[in-house]
């Protein structure tokens, strides 16, 4: 009989095989649809589909709705100022969604459902379980699949007539021009500052509206950049990037899935208004702020174009894409990147801790938040000491007795091994004669190297 680990491996293999087969079927079905469309249009290359490089070829403009279109979109066709012409504009439009996460999934879902003719999906990442509470296009069966492919499967089940191209890569200064130039509207559904500056500059250069959304914890924001004569770009509002230590993504700060659903849906709404026209005032020069704790929306006016903006002024300094990771001093992904703040003798490998120190007398401080500490603890001896209490020195009184013993080793841990280094730095400044070390890689490393059954989040 197979052991537990072998059974888990076989389960993972079967899930991946099923996901690969579904992806292959999806691609074959789309290829069949494209061939049928080409035959219906008399053959040739005027089908408006993506070429090998991912660019959308300009092709035949659709001038009438099919019976299926009328049945499918009837509820929006009867809207004032929408009608047949509005639906045709959607049918002939192309939209690029950057990031198939909590914002990109609802945005893509509503744009595909509304009848946008061509969707481009960009994401470098794969589906994992931590996505499901907010990234509603992905499923358990598609764990490990590229997010773009997973989203395409779901979107084509929703609307088989939508043409979709997957860019399963990280957008950067080298590929952005080739990808973005052929789309009508771009949605920023990313989760990092470097990508926001990249998309902004590219949209200014190629004269594309940029529908920008963000969500963190219980709050969300939405605006449209680079739209209209006086509509500002992202650099008009934020000419200088924030310091890296001031930036928090949803992986670190958390987010409620329903909040991303609200903002992503509103991104789809603004995109439809831009494409159709006449449906109301586009959210350019204004920012919508959503507070999920109160359910309140605020609509505030933001500054107009900055006359000396480096990107969108009459004499811009930025006429080509630059190295945005260098410019922002941070990575262009929402993945956690390990800090290196401590010397090697101030750090401890999780395996070494498990083998040599775990059973010995020591203080084990867990500097995660109280909410995170409630999720899981490394041991019953772990003491929750949130990082904020370390930085404001309030822990000194709380642990005055324990800290008097210089011979008692102090081990500090966190989720991924970054906050623990910050805490150790601060504590060693206070107690230079104490043995204070952090656990390299935190709880994630513990799961990888010591106990694969320990919960990871």
Swiss-Prot record:
Zn(2+) binds at residues 233, 236, 309, 312. In the N-terminal section; belongs to the HesA/MoeB/ThiF family. UBA4 subfamily. Coiled coil: none annotated. It comes from the Eukaryota. This is Adenylyltransferase and sulfurtransferase MOCS3. Binds 1 zinc ion per subunit. The keyword Transferase applies. GO terms for cellular component: cytosol. Residues 358-455 form the Rhodanese domain. Its EC number is 2.7.7.80, 2.8.1.11. It is an enzyme of class 2 (transferase). Pfam families: Rhodanese, ThiF. NCBIfam families: PRK05690.1. Its main location: cytoplasm. GO terms for molecular function: ATP binding; metal ion binding; molybdopterin-synthase adenylyltransferase activity; molybdopterin-synthase sulfurtransferase activity; thiosulfate-cyanide sulfurtransferase activity; URM1 activating enzyme activity. Plays a central role in 2-thiolation of mcm(5)S(2)U at tRNA wobble positions of cytosolic tRNA(Lys), tRNA(Glu) and tRNA(Gln). Also essential during biosynthesis of the molybdenum cofactor. Acts by mediating the C-terminal thiocarboxylation of sulfur carriers URM1 and MOCS2A. Its N-terminus first activates URM1 and MOCS2A as acyl-adenylates (-COAMP), then the persulfide sulfur on the catalytic cysteine is transferred to URM1 and MOCS2A to form thiocarboxylation (-COSH) of their C-terminus. Residues 40-60 are annotated as: Disordered. The modification Phosphothreonine is found at residue 63. It is found in: Cytoplasm, Cytosol. ATP binds at residues 102, 123, 130-134, 147, 191-192. It catalyses: [molybdopterin-synthase sulfur-carrier protein]-C-terminal Gly-Gly + ATP + H(+) = [molybdopterin-synthase sulfur-carrier protein]-C-terminal Gly-Gly-AMP + diphosphate; [molybdopterin-synthase sulfur-carrier protein]-C-terminal Gly-Gly-AMP + S-sulfanyl-L-cysteinyl-[cysteine desulfurase] + AH2 = [molybdopterin-synthase sulfur-carrier protein]-C-terminal-Gly-aminoethanethioate + L-cysteinyl-[cysteine desulfurase] + A + AMP + 2 H(+). Its cofactor is Zn(2+). Keywords: ATP-binding, Cytoplasm, Metal-binding, Molybdenum cofactor biosynthesis, Multifunctional enzyme, Nucleotide-binding, Nucleotidyltransferase, Phosphoprotein, Transferase, tRNA processing, Zinc.
């Amino acid at each position: 009989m197979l052991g537990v680990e072998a059974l888990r491996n076989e389960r993972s293999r079967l899930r991946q095989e099923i996901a690969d087969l579904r992806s292959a079927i999806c691609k074959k079905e789309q290829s069949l649809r494209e061939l049928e469309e080409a035959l219906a249009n008399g053959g040739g290359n005027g089908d408006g589909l993506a070429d090998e490089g991912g660019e959308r070829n300009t092709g035949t403009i659709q001038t009438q709705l099919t019976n299926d279109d009328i049945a499918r979109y009837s509820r929006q066709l009867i809207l004032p100022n929408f009608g047949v012409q509005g639906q045709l504009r959607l049918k002939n439009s192309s939209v690029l969604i950057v990031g198939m996460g909590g914002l990109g999934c609802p945005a893509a879902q509503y744009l595909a459902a509304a009848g946008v003719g061509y969707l481009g999906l960009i994401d470098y990442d794969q589906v994992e379980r931590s996505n499901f509470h907010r990234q509603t296009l992905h499923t358990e069966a598609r764990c490990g699949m590229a997010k773009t492919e997973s989203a395409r499967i779901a979107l084509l089940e929703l609307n088989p007539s939508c043409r979709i191209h997957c860019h399963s890569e990280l957008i950067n200064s080298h590929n952005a021009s080739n990808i973005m130039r052929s789309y009508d509207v771009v949605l920023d559904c990313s989760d990092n500052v470097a990508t926001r500056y990249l998309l902004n500059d590219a949209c200014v250069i190629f004269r594309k509206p940029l529908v920008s959304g963000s969500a963190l914890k219980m709050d969300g924001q939405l605006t449209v950049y680079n739209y209209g004569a006086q509509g500002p770009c992202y650099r008009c509002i934020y000419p200088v990037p924030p310091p890296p230590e001031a930036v928090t993504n949803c992986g670190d700060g958390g987010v409620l899935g329903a909040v991303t659903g609200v903002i992503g849906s509103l991104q789809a709404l603004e995109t439809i208004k831009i494409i159709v026209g006449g449906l109301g005032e586009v959210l350019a020069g204004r920012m919508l702020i959503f507070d999920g704790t109160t359910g309140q929306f605020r609509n505030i006016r933001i500054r107009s174009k900055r006359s000396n903006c480096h990107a969108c002024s009459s004499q811009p300094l930025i006429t080509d894409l630059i190295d945005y990771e260098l410019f922002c001093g941070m990575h262009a992904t929402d993945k956690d990147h390990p800090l290196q703040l401590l010397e090697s003798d101030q750090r401890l490998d999780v395996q070494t801790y498990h083998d040599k120190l775990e059973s010995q007398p020591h203080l084990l401080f867990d500097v995660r938040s109280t909410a995170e500490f409630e999720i899981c603890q490394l041991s019953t001896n772990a003491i929750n000491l949130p990082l904020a209490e370390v930085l404001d020195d309030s822990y000194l009184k709380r642990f005055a007795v324990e800290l008097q013993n210089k011979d008692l080793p102090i081990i500090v841990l966190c989720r991924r091994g970054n906050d623990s280094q910050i805490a150790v730095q601060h504590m060693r400044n206070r107690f230079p004669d104490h043995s204070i070390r952090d656990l390299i890689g935190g709880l994630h490393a513990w799961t990888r190297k010591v106990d694969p059954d320990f919960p990871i989040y």
